[in-house]
Amino acid sequence: MKKLILLTVVALMSVLLLAACGSGASKEVATTGESKEGNAEQGVSGILDTIKQRDKIVFGVKHDTKLFGLKDPATGEVAGFDIDIARQIAKEILGDENKAEFVEVTSKTRIPLLNKGDIDAIVATMTITEERKKEVDFSNVYFEAGQSLLVKKGSPVQSIEDLTKDTPVLAVKGSTSTINIRNAAPDAPVLEFENYAEAFTALKAGQGVALTTDNAILLGMASEDNSFELVGGTFTDEPYGIAVKKGNTELVDAINGVLDTLKSNGEYDAIYKKWFDLQ
C-alpha cells in the first residue's frame, strides 16, 4: 500500500514538473516573439538614430539620368539635381554634405534595394503614385515633372495622337512611363529597356520612333544630342518624392523639414537653376 502511494506521488510530481517546464518554454517563446516584433518596429522608427551613429546616410540614385544623376566614367563621380538635394539632406541631418553615400538604382531595382536595407532613401526621379504608397512612404513633392515624347528632329510624330501600331515607343522597365504610354496610346508597341542610357541608344539606332519618360529627363537627353527634341507638351503629371521604407515617418519628417528649409533659404532655387537654367 505504501509502495502504491509512493508511486502515485512520484507520478503526480512528474506531471506537475513537465507542466511547469512546458509553461516556461511557452513563455520563453512568446517573450522571444515579442522581442523580435519590438526590434522590427525599432528598426524602422530608430533609423534616424542609426544614421547618426553610422555618421552617413545612404541614398539610392540614378547613374544614367543627365541633369538628375549621371556618373562620369572618367572620375566615377555622380552629379545632378537629385545628387545635390541628397547632399543637402545629409548636410542638414549630419552637418556635412560629404556624409551622403550613393548607391546606383534603376526604376526596377530601387524599391527592392530600399526594402532590403541597402539604402536609407531613394532620390531618383521617383513619381509619387497611390500604388507605390502601398510599398514605401514618400516625402513631400520636391520636383514637378510631366511625361512627354523625345523624337528625332523632323519626325512625323509630333504628339501623343500621332502614335499608332506602326510607331514603336521606347520606355524604361519599372517606370510609370510604361503604364502611362500604354494608356495614352494603346495601339503603339512599347519596347522596354533596363535604363535610360539603353533606351536612348536604342532611339538613336532607330529601334523606335519616340522615347517616353518625364520631360525633365528627356531634356537632359536632348541637351546631350541636339538632333533630338521634345514634342507635344506633357500628357501626365509626375510629382517626384523621396522614398523611405514603409512606416519610417521619423525620416520622412526629417527630410520634409530639410526640403522646407531649402525652399525658404533659397538653396532649392539655386540648385534648380544650376541644372535646369539651360538657356
Model regions: which residues?
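Bacterial lipoprotein signal-peptidase II cleavage site
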Residues: L6, L17-T32
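Extended ligand-binding regions for polar small-molecule ligands
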Residues: G22, G33-E37, E41, I83-D84, ...
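Periplasmic-binding protein-like
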Residues: H63, E144-V151, A197, N215, ...
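A ligand-binding cleft/hinge motif common to bilobed small-molecule-binding domains
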Residues: T109, M126-K134, N180-N183, K204-D237
